[in-house]
Amino acid sequence: AFSGKYLSVFLTNLGDIETRLRDFIVGLKRVFASTYGPDPILYRVDHGLLDYDERMAMVVQKVVGQRFGDYFLPFASGVMFSRNVYAWNPKIKKEEGLVRLVFGLGTRAVDRVGSDYPRMIPLSHPQLRPEITAPQIKKYSQKQLDVLNLKKGIMETVDFRTLSAVMDHPELFYAVSVQKNGHLAPPMFKTQNLKGEE
């Protein structure tokens, strides 16, 4: 799929109007220039599209989310596929699709990064997961997330523990598991203090 081949630019939209306009124009130029990057060109070569005129439309949209300290992020983001080519169980219906879900900005749902993993959700059986044991679930879980740092004016990657220290949000209950005696479980209650938990 062509999704994720072109550059996405996140702006914090802070400062005076001249600064924000300048940042916006620079962002537009960076996205348009990304049509000449290696990923889009290789994709076009692989699909016999290299000799076609490359046209691009630009989408500018507001990031929906909340501020937590210096960070701004959506609680969850994802990418949905109309066909699931990663069916790890015979019960999964490939034609019903797949969602790759992450905590924070959706950049990690589009492109998997290093040893960090999105949550894979088959739409035919959303409770099924490819991991079975607690160590597997822990290994193949998201540990870092992308956020907008409003103080620095940039998108950056933060460790989940760094964010949880400034995030007082009852919905965090749905994004974490607590390990006790070799088992993973949701926190006991929504307001449980997770500091010091594994």
What function would you assign to each model-found segment?
Residues 1-198:
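Conserved mixed alpha/beta core segments that line enzyme active sites in large multi-domain catalysts
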